[in-house]
Structures are given as C-alpha cells and as structure tokens.
Curated annotation (Swiss-Prot):
Gene name per UniProt: SCRN1
Lineage: superkingdom: Eukaryota
Keywords: Acetylation, Cytoplasm, Exocytosis
PANTHER family: SECERNIN, SECERNIN-1
Pfam families: Peptidase_C69 (PF03577)
Misc. comment: 'Secern' is an archaic English term meaning 'secrete'.
Family membership noted in the UniProt record: Belongs to the peptidase C69 family. Secernin subfamily.
Protein name: Secernin-1
Organism: Homo sapiens
Length: 414
C-alpha cells in the first residue's frame, strides 16, 4: 500500500466564523475500500470495576459515559471523528514523527477519540482524559485492516467545544497541546505545534534531550524537535484553503472546503479516498443546540451532509451501521485480518449507485449531484431556522432527524 495522504480537520472561531458559531470540520482519508459507519451510543452508567473493550485492549471503565455520535471505520471500536451530548467534538490525525510508532497493540488514536468524547464534558476535560490514558496504556497497533503489514502512527487531535479548542500532538506517551480561541486552525497529518504550548508532558523536554534531538539551549520548538528528518507531506494548500476565505466562514463554507479536491483536502487517489466527513456547528450562545452533520458515505463532493442533534430520545439509525460479526470478526481474532468481510451498510450500498452514475455519465451525473446538493440545502435551511429561532428546541421534533435524512437519501437513490 502506498503512503497515506494527509487527512484534514479545521476549526473556525467568531468573528472569522459567522453569527457567533464555532465551526468544526474533518475529512477522513483512509484506504479506498474501507467502510465508515455512523453510530449513536446513549449515555450509560457502568458497574464498579467493569472493563471496556477497545479495538485491541481492554481498560477500566468509568462510572458514567456521555452520549456520543461517531463516524468510524466499521472494523474498530473507536472513532475518526465525533461529538458528545455536551458539545465536545474530537477528530484525530495519524502522524509520523522522529520516533517510530509502536506496532505493539495498545490504544489506537481512534480509541482515544471515542474515550475523550465518552468521558469529557469540555474540550479541556477530554484532553486530560486522552493524555492520562496515553500515559497509562500507550498507543500502538495497526491503523488499517491489513494482514500483510502493520501501519502504525502517532496521533494528533483537534478537540473543540463552544468556547475553545485544543490542538494535542503526541509522540508515544509524550505530548504537547496548544489552546486556541480565535481565528482558523487546521491540523493535518504532520506536527504543527511550534513554541506556543499551553500544556505538555512533564518529561517532554528531558526526553527530547535524552534522544539527542534537543540540546536544551535556545527556544524549544516542538515540530522542529520531533518531526521526521525527511517529511515529504505538503499540507500547505489544504491548510490555506479555509484560512484564505475572505468572507465569514459558515457551515456551507466548511462543507465546500472539505469537498475541495484541487487543494488536496478531499482525497481521491489510487489507494486512498475521503471515506467519510463531518461538520459541527457549536453556537457560543448556550441556549442554541449544537448541530452535527455526517456523510456516512465516501467522497464529500458526491455525498450529502445530514444533520444530527442530541436530545434524550434519539431514534437509532441501523441503515448507517455495518453488520456486526461478533467474536467471529477477523479484526477480533488473532492473527488479525485474515479475511475481509463485507462491512457495507444500507446507506453505503445505496450510495454506491450514485457514485457510479456521477463517475460514468456526465449529464445524468451532473443532474444527480445537483439534486443531492438540493436535498442537503433543504436540511441546512431547516437547521438555520433552529439556530435563529427564539423558541426553545422541541426534542420530539429532532429525535428522528438523522434517521429521516438517511431514509430520504436511500429512497432517493433507489
């Protein structure tokens, strides 16, 4: 398999983002044939001393986990991106650093995304959860469903709530983080922190010295110290794609950015594809609900972003969930990944038809894509009404919001 291209995630704060909204977006660049599912897990109480089984290892469970909505490769436990009931959003990026990532199975970066969402009521709390679990359990194991070789990475995270974001970058159990409260920030699959660090592992600098990567003299620049000597990734055009927007950034701007293939933000190559995308809108006014949009299908330029709002009685959406193989899943048996089961969910299968038409028939494909975008626009307009309304949100009206959007999309494709 060729080297993985960069994934991108972005956050924009007011006043760069419009109407007092924090806007968050993420593209997940993964192997072309990998299916991502979108799954809701309700808040739950857990027995004392119970365990939670992550992708490769089990760890201690906490007494209570928050409700989450996540987009994840269907073979693993964690998440590429997601949100929780408190308006915390997290996405991660696989990164290469001077220190090779561990192939020994531990927590995956994606596991830490989900654990942060389940356990963190604010962005800072989620950050603290992730770094403490990193210290305790480490990170490692195969990031891809591939029996032939182990693709292991270090991880970077963008952790966002209504008030602030944290950029967290990790090297093994060592880490540094920067707090962001204004402007636009992008992380992609390389280190980005330099000399501004608002929190760090207590032994980070002494570790860098022990490896001969820093003399201990002069200013400590995280990226310079820990980036690989030969870093061929160029994230420049992608990073600039949102920052160079002259107008205020809206949810539509973020979606357009994630659909941009020319800048490299949207990946469509021989081995890799943007397999799922997500956008979240977090109003700084707490009387307005956070709204989270997920595609659940590959290639955002040929997909529909569908809205979801956390309420007490969410209608589950089995049509975006992959089949469950239980203990027979090749990802759970050792040696792992000896087979690749069909993980396509109902929405994914319906969407394959649309992708084929858009790729093969110019006229019909253009009309189909135009109709898809019109469907999406109707959803965006309905959400805009909710955000600008002075009336309190009626939970009964939005509990089946994502379900209805998925159902409409599948019927449309059929």
């Amino acid at each position: 398999m060729a080297a993985a291209p960069p994934s991108y995630c972005f956050v924009a704060f007011p006043p760069r983002a419009k109407d007092g909204l924090v806007v968050f977006g993420k593209n997940s660049a993964r192997p072309r044939d990998e299916v991502q599912e979108v799954v809701y897990f309700s808040a739950a109480d857990h027995e004392p001393e119970s365990k939670v089984e992550c992708t490769y290892i089990s760890i201690d469970q906490v007494p209570r986990t928050y409700a989450i909505m996540i987009s994840r490769p269907a073979w693993l436990w964690g998440a590429e991106m997601g949100a929780n009931e408190h308006g915390v959003c997290i996405a991660n990026e696989a990164i290469n650093t001077r220190e090779p990532a561990a192939e020994i199975e531990a927590l995956l970066g994606m596991d830490l995304v989900r654990l942060g969402l389940e356990r963190g009521e604010t962005a800072k709390e989620a950050l603290d959860v992730i770094v403490s679990l990193l210290e305790e359990h480490g990170q490692g194991g195969n990031y891809f469903e591939d029996a032939n070789s182990c693709h292991s990475f270090q991880s970077a995270y963008l952790i966002v709530d209504r008030d602030e974001a944290w950029v967290l970058e990790t090297i093994g159990k060592y880490w540094a983080a920067e707090k962001v409260t204004e402007g636009v920030r992008c992380i992609c699959s390389q280190l980005s922190l330099t000399t501004k660090m608002d929190a760090e592992h207590p032994e980070l600098r002494s570790y860098a010295q022990s490896q001969g990567w820093w003399t201990g003299e002069g200013e400590f620049n995280f990226s310079e110290v820990f980036s690989p000597v030969e870093d061929h990734l160029d994230c420049g055009a992608g990073k600039d794609s949102l920052e160079k927007q002259e107008e205020s950034i809206t949810v539509q701007t973020m979606m357009n950015t994630l659909r941009d293939k020319a800048s490299g933000v949207c990946i469509d190559s021989e081995f890799f594809l943007t397999t799922a995308s997500g956008v979240s809108v977090l109003p700084q006014n707490r009387s307005s609900p956070c709204i989270h949009y997920f595609t659940g299908t590959p290639d955002p330029s040929r997909s529909i972003f569908k809205p979801f709002i956390f309420v007490d009685d969410v209608k589950l959406v089995p049509k975006t969930q992959s089949p469950c193989f239980g203990d027979d899943d090749p990802a759970k048996k050792e040696p792992r990944f000896q087979e690749k089961p069909d993980r396509r969910h109902e929405l994914y299968k319906a969407h394959e038809w649309a992708r084929a038409i858009i790729e093969s028939d110019q006229e019909q494909g253009r009309k189909l894509r135009s109709t898809m975008l019109e469907l999406e626009k109707q959803g965006l307009e309905a959400m805009e009404e909710i955000l600008t309304s002075s009336e309190p949100l009626d939970p009964a009206e939005v509990g089946d919001l994502f379900y209805d959007c998925v159902d409409t999309e599948i019927k449309f494709f059929k």
